[in-house]
């Protein structure tokens, strides 16, 4: 399944920058960054359960927020890209 994960972490307080880095790393471990606080993540249900628990354990819900957009099985037809940073097909062939 394809999930778009977005986050907003308050960095003005002590520990905020560290939480921001940890949230970004958790997302990077499962997907690709498409904007500063936006990741495209293609996971199976077990991986999603693990990532979601990890993310929600990292944030302070009174200051930070996470948003999940479930794009479904036909996500490639629903996503359009214009401009720099072309999309990477994580399921496609890898040429080394």
Residue ranges and their predicted role:
Residues 3-4, 10-96:
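Basic nucleic-acid-binding interfaces
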